[in-house]
Amino acid sequence: MNNLAGHLVKYGKHRVRRSYSRIKEVLDLPNLIEVQTDSYKWFLDEGLREMFDDIMPIEDFQGKLSLEFVDYQLLEPKYTVEEARQHDANYSAPLHVTLRLINHETGEIKSQDVFFGDFPLMTKQGTFIINGAERVIVSQLVRSPGVYFNSELDKNGRTNYGTTVIPNRGAWLEYETDAKNVAYVRIDRTRKIPLTELIRALGYGSDNEIVEILGSNSDSLMLTLEKDVHKNMDDSRVEESLKDIYERLRPGEPKTADSSRSLLTARFFDPKRYDLAPVGRYKINKKLDLKTRLLNLTVAETLADPDTGEIIVNKDEVIDKQVMDKLAPYLARDDFKTFTFHPSEEGVVQEPMTLQIVKVYSPKDPEKVVNVIGNANVDIQFKHITPADIVASMNYFFNLQEGMGSTDDIDHLGNRRTRSVGELLQNQFRIGLSRMERVVRERMSIQDTSTVTPQQLINIRPVVASIKEFFGSSQLSQFMDQTNPLGELSHKRRFSALGPGGLTRDRAGYEVRDVHYTHYGRMCPIETPEGPNIGLINSLSSYARINKYGFVETPYRRVSWETHKVTDKIDYLTADEEDNYVIAQANSPLNDDGSFVDDVVMARKKDDDVEISTEKVDYMDVSPKQVVAVATACIPFLENDDSNRALMGANMQRQAVPLIKPHAPLVGTGIEYKAAHDSGVALISEHEGTVEYVDAREIRVRRDDGSLDKYKLMKFHRSNGGKNYNQTPIVRVGDRVDADEVLADGPAMENGELALGQNPLIAFMTWDGYNFEDAIAINERLVKEDVYTSIHIEEHESEARDTKLGPEEITREIPNVGEDALKNLDEFGIIRIGAEVKDGDILVGKVTPKGVTELSAEERLLHAIFGEKAREVRDTSLRVPHGAGGIVQDVKIFTREGGDELSPGVNMMVRVYIAQKRKLQVGDKMAGRHGNKGTVSVVIPEEDMPFMPDGTPIDIMLSPMGVPSRMNIGQVLDLHLGMAARKLGIHVASPVFDGARDEDIWSALQEAGLPGDGKTVLYDGRTGEAFDNRIAVGVMYYLKLAHMVDDKIHARSIGPYSLVTQQPLGGKAQFGGQRFGEMEVWALEAYGAAYTLQEILTYKSDDVVGRVKTYEAIVKGEPIPKPGVPESFRVLVKELQALGMDMKVLDADKNEIELRDMDDEDDDIVNVDALKKFAKEQEEKKAKEAEQETAEKEETKTE
């Protein structure tokens, strides 16, 4: 087969596609959910132990007792994953910690195993089961700890520099200059103090020492020293500075040098209070390291080998890349150009400070010699900041004014890191442990030291509570999107910049949300939500991974420096490493030996796209799809779509509903198999072997060593989104299977591939205006043949509780309900499985005791005779809500006797699952993969649809107007190639950025015997006449989305009212009304529709008495009475009175109108026996009239 026609690629064992890719894949996609699983594994293996080592040993205040950590272990989980789902429990394992209590007075050691609560475990699919629901912990993108330099122009055009030292936790340190060029420091966002005072406080008091240490005679430092004068001669300079700092940090408290020393030590030099984390130490050492800072500067001294005296760099020599390669090993040594400074006794830190200093010429003033000071590579074990870090960062800050060094871009992915599950959990666990530590200390001082045991000291409540809080209510712990496998996979690979310690939606500006050049190969530039979260929630690119520091890395093929050939050696680079290299694109043509075909290639260097000689190329992309996320990589011809529409396409694929008969796309991208395989919905074999038994519920595989693996399939489960989760076997008895092979398809899968929709026949044409504005006209065949039919399962729950008046009861005996309504209930009053139910039907019969009323004499007599008190109960049965009818698929009953854990006060709980078969109907939302969405506007009988010359009717008609302005031409290419694939009976793969070209599509059409322009004559099904022009007809993958009209349609009859305003509630869930808002009122006012407006604002809204009276009048056929005062007006009056205003309502004659309180109208509101009351009033009225009549007659007689 020639290259033009593509080549065959096998995906799994059941699907072969003709692939049009031209670029050889050198690296397989990684496991797509390893972001989750690897991080959690790290937490269990290392993170937990780290936490215990950090907090322990815990010593009491006198130092008599200490509690040490020995080891921990997780025991077997109480429930399996499936049982946890059914019991609404957590899938978790008990954590046991071995602790050792040492009594320093007696030398006695007690070891004990302490239970530390149940710890949620991650399932194989990378999710957690919390209270029976699957949840995902989304990774968080935060600013990395480290030292950052920034610059901004002031109003006079001067560049002001600023520096921020950000720890993982602890106080921030900021340096800045003011308009007069005086340098200041802020500690933890407090008021600023001259920068030199901080150095004095560290124990270097004199001006000369400061100039020597900072190695700078810059104007800014000199001005700062002038500003920082010795005010109180009784104190030394060090003590004075300490007191000044204390005054800023604790204003109003008596200041002493000692208290200031202990405060600063606690703020910056205590590892428990100040933590840079390994990543912060790594970033600070990297930024302050002389290797990067000396590049391209001219040295002002000769640098020689300290051992041999051999000259490495001559004075006045420029340090370029070659010189630096020679110098770098020396700079890494402890004895090369290092100087030690000893602080005075009065300083905060007593240890001497070692700095690495090299003299260079200032780039701004070549005569001026400036010191470049490094922190001498502080050891990685120092979690807190050191004086050397402070001094080196100040030196960098002053050197920026000399034109040395660079400022940082905070949106660069080298300065943002991810916190994945493991780290988020670890932080939460730390909070719990530190709360526990406080309790342990207190208990140590209270309890008898001779008899106390570790168990008595430990209170695990704070630990358990913090873990529970994290999984239950953290912003990053989310209810898993289980609409389809792609949604599930994308959710696990998501990054959020929101959440605790992150940004907030309102504060996030344009820059943070924007696509940055460092996103290339790390974060998808396409897949992000539309709306307020745009750019704050992102998706991991397909090949990216996260390194131990939390930075996102992407793979590149190394280019050999000697031969300039591309090797198969793969290096993973973080964003700041990548900045040093020139990287060629994946589609640069290569010869068979790996050398570049052309002498010049397109490449990237930082944020530039450059045409560059191949000799200067360091790396090459591994694949064209490494730029995008998995969902985006599922869009064929992505390169022909506008990015805004591609964004919609990527997002809408995640909302596709799993159909009854799914079909994989005829035109795929080749990633469908991998996406479905890794999503966790397919059944995957664990070992290789031979299939021995297959049915709908179980598959058995005989391993080569003779043992048997049994795999249970999930049948018709309800997924998180109420969709149907069902697995279907795709292997047969006798098949050989490999380890890690798909045995059974999950929802929205076919033959191991992702199958989110169908391949209907589509024409771009109009049809009587029915596809105006993105509407879709569909063939009735799609409804009749269940092409787009899906199953939805809803869960309904009823609890029988204990009430003050007695227990509720689940029963068939329901007051005032006819036998007909009970026909589908069993003897306990619970619906039968398989019964067909509609709105308002009883699912679970339940009665609740009513308050006992005073009995009449007759009733008391009856009770005395029959001995039984008439039970006063009301019907509180669970009924089918509006629009939720269907077939009862399952019923689960939970009781304490059955060993189920129920919440207090609940005696029994019944869950009913109702399955609905939803066919495609008018109002449903559909979409292609290119952001081409629309709603179904008309279902046309098959015989009326336009048909092709061979008589085949079209399935879907789309408006051609939806293509040009939206610039998603990919859908047209998808359509043509799909048509060719259908005719040829093949599946094709067109990978993103490396797919079928125009000529491939035309040759495929030719091969299939179709016209070269992909158009055909269509005939009108109603008249049989041909349409004037030929029409583009083809096969395009089309999805039905989760926004279905059945879930949205709603109408209120009689429903609930809001308590305070007495207005109807809003929304379908509350069975609410339609809001008639301010603007709608204007519309009626404009038309002068006074009476309509009046009834909308009174009877139909919150005139409580009026609406009852109106109801009575309608029932009796009498004229409707005048409206009363709306309740909201009464609320307004009450609010004003609450503010102390004496407000009265007067009529035209200045008489006060009595606003009766709601309590006075109680009977009316409740509407209890309103008709009886009304009848009684009528009778009284008639009686009065009759009396009056007789009285009048009497009067006339007497006259």
Swiss-Prot record:
Function: DNA-dependent RNA polymerase catalyzes the transcription of DNA into RNA using the four ribonucleoside triphosphates as substrates.
Gene3D superfamilies on file: 2.40.50.100, 2.40.50.150, 3.90.1100.10, DNA-directed RNA polymerase, beta subunit, external 1 domain (2.30.150.10), DNA-directed RNA polymerase, subunit 2, domain 6 (2.40.270.10), RNA polymerase alpha subunit dimerisation domain (3.90.1800.10), RNA polymerase Rpb2, domain 2 (3.90.1110.10)
Nucleotidyltransferase in keyword set: yes
KW Transferase (keyword) present: yes
Molecular function GO labels: DNA binding; DNA-directed RNA polymerase activity; ribonucleoside binding
Annotated EC: 2.7.7.6
Catalytic activity: RNA(n) + a ribonucleoside 5'-triphosphate = RNA(n+1) + diphosphate
Enzyme class, spelled out: transferase
Keyword annotations of the record: DNA-directed RNA polymerase, Nucleotidyltransferase, Transcription, Transferase
Gene Ontology BP annotations: DNA-templated transcription
Family membership noted in the UniProt record: Belongs to the RNA polymerase beta chain family.
Matches recorded under CDD domains: RNA_pol_B_RPB2 (cd00653)
Name the record gives this protein: DNA-directed RNA polymerase subunit beta
Assembly description: The RNAP catalytic core consists of 2 alpha, 1 beta, 1 beta' and 1 omega subunit. When a sigma factor is associated with the core the holoenzyme is formed, which can initiate transcription.
Protein's gene: rpoB
Organism (species): Ligilactobacillus salivarius (strain UCC118) (Lactobacillus salivarius)
Annotated stretches, region: Disordered: 1177-1199
Gene Ontology terms: cellular component: DNA-directed RNA polymerase complex
Pfam families per the UniProt record, alphabetical: RNA_pol_Rpb2_1, RNA_pol_Rpb2_2, RNA_pol_Rpb2_3, RNA_pol_Rpb2_45, RNA_pol_Rpb2_6, RNA_pol_Rpb2_7
